[in-house]
Amino acid sequence: MGTASRVTYWCGKLFVYCVAASLPLFAQEPATPALNSRTQSSDTKKNYLVLDIVVTDKSGNAITKVLEEKDFSVLDSGKPEKIIAFRAIAGEALEVQPNDPPVKIILMVDEINTSFSKVGYERIQIAKFLQQNGGKLSHPVSMGYFSDKGIEVDDDSTRDGNVLLASFDQHVTALRSSKESAGFYGTVERFQRSVNALNSLASKESHLPGRKMIIWMSPGWPLLSGPGVDLSYKQRDGMFATIVSASTALRLARITLYSVDPVGVENADSSAGSLYEEFLKPVTVAKKAQAGNLALQVLARQSGGLALRASNDISNQLNRCLADADAYYTLAIDPAPADNAAMYHAVDVKVVPGLIARTRDGYYVQP
């Protein structure tokens, strides 16, 4: 067996082992949010598909007009679906119902995948973000940290950026031991830790009601995809199951994921930062499953969030993410149950002409 063949073989073996252990199939269902009175009847079911939607103009700018249910339509795999629940949340103009709390926002600082040379600048930009407007943030935020210790999230959220900055300054940066010379093995370990961390966070949040926004500050974890990785049919089956689990976990927890790359414009002209775009198309069959389909940026875009990069103004990028909590819409449909193996359903939410609805692009149904 030649060197290239050995690399391909061990890449496939190690990669599939790590991924298969990373994300279990999720059986738990979150409580159905109280969107309006129509969801309170005795026949309320837990398998509603709940969509959190941000509406912008074609340039990506938020709109000030509050839309109504009649302005929305939902297509499930091309078929019109009846909207069974609807709510408009426009900043503080509309009161939040007791059973559907304000959006929960976590700013997650990735200390596993961010190089040591970038940490100092990243910290400066986070401090700038937290101290803007005299330390008064537009929405409550919790600080979170992903390090060798795993996931740590502050118990309390606050709009007081100075309080968050004090917590941030007290946090002891636990950057990973340098594995840059560890070759593939170090890369696989980072991938496994990252996928496990997202799994852990989604599992915890799935038990809590309401919408969550996770802003993950990271260049992303290794894609582990390319000409040197050739998976068998069995390995691709396992990969597909993991992709389905990851997507389902985020959906059940009502998490909209965002990625903000702290590297800045340094790699703006590099194809490495945008390589994830090759994996944005949802995986519908196991034979097309690849590791890149689990990239942070891919999961973010598919969840209805943003993947931001190539800017030195990280504070501004964080504000772009936070703006999604200013005004959004939540609606629910009642999809038909699956009658065979895991099947992907594309979701297309349409609004009035001239506007764009950004939300989850689809979901997997399982028998």
Identify the function of each model-found stretch:
Residues 1-10:
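N-terminal secretory signal peptides that target proteins for export/translocation
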Residues 8, 15, 360-362:
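Small/flexible residues
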